[in-house]
Every structure is written in C-alpha cells, then in structure tokens.
C-alpha cells in the first residue's frame, strides 16, 4: 500500500512537472516575436512648434547639435508635457514604464485625448506593469479614436490569474520596459527618469520623487523616435485589444468624465504663477543649451536573452563613459547596487585619483527595503575606497525651502544621472543596479556640455550639503551619518536614522538573501 502511494505521488509530481514545462514551452512559442519593418520618419513642418522654434534650432553650432533645457521644478515637468500636446498637429509618441491611474495620469491621458480629437496621430507604448484592470477603458478609448493606438510591452496573457503565469514564464515576465520618452511632432522630446504619476510631479501625494527631465529638440529627437519605433515594431508589444474586452458604456463614460474633470480641476493649479519653458525660450528670457547628443538604449530583445548571459547595450555604453573619468565622477542613483563588477570599475577610477561622489536614497527615503538592504552591504567598502557617499533625507513636506533642480520637498530620490569631469552628462532611465543592467530595458542620452554639467554638479553639491546625510567611517570603523542642520552644524548618528530596532535586525537578514541579481 505504501509503495502504491509513493508511486502515485511520484506520478503526480512528474505529471505536474510535465504540465508546467509543456505550458512554459507552449506560451513562449506562442509569444515568439515577429518584428515589423520600421517606417521612415518625418517631421511635422506645419507644426507651430517647428515654426516658432526653427530660429532657435538654426542657431545651433552645427547641424549635429541639438537644443536642450532642463525641466524643473516638479509640476513644471507635467505642465510642459500638457502644453506640448496642446500644440501638436501631427504625431505624439509616448513611451512609459508606468502611467498611473491617478490625477497626473488622468491629466496626461486627457491631454492626449484632446490631441486625438484634433486628428493628431497618437501612439502610446506602456509596460504591462501598470495596465491590469484598465484594459477595458483603454480599449474603448482607442475604439473612439482610430488615430489613437496603444500597445503593451511584454504582456501577461492570463490577465486575471497572473501569478501562475509569472511562475511559468519566470524570468521573462519579470523583465520590464523601463524606458521613458515623449515626442511631439518629431520636433521636441522629453526624456529622463520620470514616469507619469502623482509622485513624479508633486501632485496630491505624500511621496514625491526628486528626478531629472530634459526637453530636447534637433537631430537627437529622430534618434528617440527610432528607439520608440524599434520597440513599437519589435513584435514584443501587443495591441491593447488583444488583452481584454471593451468597457460598457456606463463605465467608460464615468472614466472619461473622470479624465476631463481632473484636467479641468488641476490645469489652473499647474499654470498658476508658472512661466513655461517654451514661451520663455521663444521670448529669449532663458537661453537654451546646445550639444551633440547620443541617444542610447537596449534592444527590446534583451528580455529574450538569458539573465546569466545578459546582452545590455546600455550597460556597455554607461560603463564606457564612466571609464573616461579623469578628475571627477558624480552619480545620482535612486537604487545603487554596484555589484562586484561595478565595484571593480569604481576601484579602478579611485586608483587613478578620480574623485567619486554618489547620491542615493537613505533607508527613510528608499521605497524598496530589499534594495536598501542589498545596497547597505556596499557602504563600508565604498567609504574605505574613498568614495563620498550621501543619502537623501526624507524631507519635511511642509518645510519652507528654495527650489532646486532636484526639487525642494522631495521624500525620495528617483533620478538616474551621472556627470563626468563636469563635462559629460548622462540622463535617462538607467539605475546603477542589476535590474537595469540585466533584466529591464533602458534608455538615456549622453552629451558633452561643460557649462551645463558644471551648473548641475554644483547644484547637486549644494543640495546634498543641506538635504542629505553624509556617511563616514567613525570609531572602530563603524558607520556614521552626518545630518545637516539649518544652522550649518551637523548632528552625528551612530545608528541608521529613522530605523526601528526591529528594522535594524531585519536589514542584515534581508541583505543575506541571495536575491541581489534580481534587484
């Protein structure tokens, strides 16, 4: 009897394994990509954006130079997106990792919808991380406007029971499109670290991210569009219609009313006492920067490669630029997990006498504890190496502070940028962690501009002097956090600030888990 029971259990286990492997093979074969040819790109020369800013573009030092200007503070970055959509006459291409179902997301979608009403061709490419339970209204939206297309990158197919599919298709379903870009009429592009959501624009949200965005115009915009089309036509994106059913009339009407009501409520708030970048550039009140800009990005096929043999074009490009540092490297990284390989790169720079400064999140400002736990294992080695290490304080939301490029009342760092020798600049979606290097697809822009790099570098140094803990090795080589105070003095913490005793016990246990390669 016992032998029979064991045989039955063994048969059940083998059957389950065979079913699991069979389902995995079937799904992955079904989802094998079938790329389309990329179309030729064109510029909407009848666009007001082209007519109004041609003179500024014509002032570039060479045809290879692009115009650029940083977007700050937080709400201005959302307002510029809205006003760009308002002026569109030809095309809008938007690519985001997250497009939240909140006020900022509603405002953004309403701006796109208004453009679609005018006949603008809209293409919205979003990752599946933020689509679940909204497929129905998005399907109705594109049904209402044939010139509004939505595609979803690397979608799950079992929409209501994602966890079993996640297990079957791991690690592919854990690999996401982290790219972020927004292009209007082929004239202007915005790229940087921001997704679309309240926390990225300080809009009715207790959590506010400090981040970078830059507005670009010129030849680099065509590179951004090529990146967009590479993903759009990769065969790894699915039309929104294939992922669900259209919402009924009542539900769709309620949703559309929510979009328009939110837009009408918040637009006056966004515009109050704010001078937009584009009109200010046109009037000559602010001066644009010019640089030869290189747009870099991972192939969408990266999600098909083995995580143990990653093919990351972004990692190679980023490492190549960092490796050119001769005097100074400044890194702003929301999630900083350098890995053994990254530590070797930084050690090589320090051996050459390069000053390295890193700004990342503290425990109190980090929104992912397991990431902080992994990062915490690198702090002492970095300090021993001579790296200047700063951790952002989680800011008092009601403090009265001056605005800076990173924002004044931010509770968490989300920026992904670095600056080499106060001359070379990188901005994009790439975090200094294994998830960006191995798992997700990423994009960014690299350019040289000494004046801009010096300005931003100095702003960041001024920012950390008042808004971040400076880490030191104190007595017995123990970590200390120097907290800047308003009177210019420092308070020294010998224990990690804003952490309970329970959390202090948990942190090394979490750090011990073998999950760094997933973070």
Task: Please report, for each region that a protein language model flagged, where it lies by residue.
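Charged, low-complexity intrinsically disordered terminal segments
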Residues: 2-175, 184-519
């Amino acid at each position: 009897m016992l032998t029979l029971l064991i045989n039955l259990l063994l048969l059940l286990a083998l059957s389950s394994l065979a079913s699991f492997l069979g389902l995995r093979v079937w799904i992955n074969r079904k989802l094998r990509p079938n790329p389309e040819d990329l179309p030729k790109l064109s510029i909407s020369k009848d666009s007001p954006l082209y007519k109004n800013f041609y003179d500024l573009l014509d002032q570039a030092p060479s045809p290879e130079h692009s115009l650029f200007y940083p977007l700050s503070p937080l709400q201005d970055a959302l307002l510029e997106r809205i006003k760009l959509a308002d002026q569109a006459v030809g095309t809008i291409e938007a690519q985001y990792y997250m497009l939240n179902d909140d006020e900022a997301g509603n405002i953004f979608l309403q701006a796109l919808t208004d453009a679609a009403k005018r006949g603008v061709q809209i293409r919205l490419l979003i990752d599946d991380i933020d689509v679940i339970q909204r497929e129905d209204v998005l399907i109705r939206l594109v049904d209402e406007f044939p010139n509004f297309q939505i595609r979803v990158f690397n979608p799950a197919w079992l929409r209501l029971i994602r966890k079993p599919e996640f297990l079957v298709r791991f690690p592919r379903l854990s690999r996401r499109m982290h790219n972020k870009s927004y292009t209007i009429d082929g004239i202007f592009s915005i790229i940087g670290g921001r997704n679309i959501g309240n926390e990225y624009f300080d809009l009715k949200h207790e959590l506010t991210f400090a981040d970078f965005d830059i507005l670009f115009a010129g030849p680099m915009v065509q590179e951004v569009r090529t990146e967009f089309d590479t993903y759009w036509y990769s065969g790894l994106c699915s039309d929104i219609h294939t992922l669900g059913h259209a919402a009924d009339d009542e539900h769709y009407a309620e949703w559309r009313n929510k979009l328009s009501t939110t837009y009408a409520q918040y637009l006056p708030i966004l515009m109050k006492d704010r001078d937009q970048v584009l009109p200010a550039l046109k009037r000559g009140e602010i001066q644009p920067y010019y640089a030869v800009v290189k747009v870099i990005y991972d192939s969408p096929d990266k999600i098909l490669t083995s995580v143990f043999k990653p093919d990351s074009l972004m990692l190679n490009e980023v490492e190549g630029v960092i490796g050119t540092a001769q005097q100074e490297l400044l890194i702003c990284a929301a999630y900083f997990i350098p890995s053994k390989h990254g530590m070797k790169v930084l050690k090589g720079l320090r051996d050459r006498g390069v000053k390295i400064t890193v700004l990342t999140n503290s425990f109190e400002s980090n929104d992912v504890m397991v990431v902080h736990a992994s990062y915490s294992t690198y702090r002492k080695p970095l300090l021993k190496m001579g790296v200047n290490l700063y951790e952002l304080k989680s800011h008092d939301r009601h403090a009265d502070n001056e605005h800076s490029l990173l924002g004044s009342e931010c509770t968490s760092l989300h920026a992904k940028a670095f600056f080499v020798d106060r001359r070379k600049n990188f901005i994009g979606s790439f975090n200094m962690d294994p998830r960006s290097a191995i798992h997700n697809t990423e994009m960014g822009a690299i350019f040289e501009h000494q004046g801009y790099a010096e300005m931003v570098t100095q702003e960041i140094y001024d920012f950390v002097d008042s808004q971040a803990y400076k880490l030191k090795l104190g007595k017995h080589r123990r970590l200390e956090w120097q907290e800047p105070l308003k009177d210019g003095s420092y308070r020294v913490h010998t224990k990690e600030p804003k952490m309970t005793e329970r959390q202090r016990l948990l942190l090394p246990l979490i750090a011990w888990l073998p999950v760094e390669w997933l973070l």
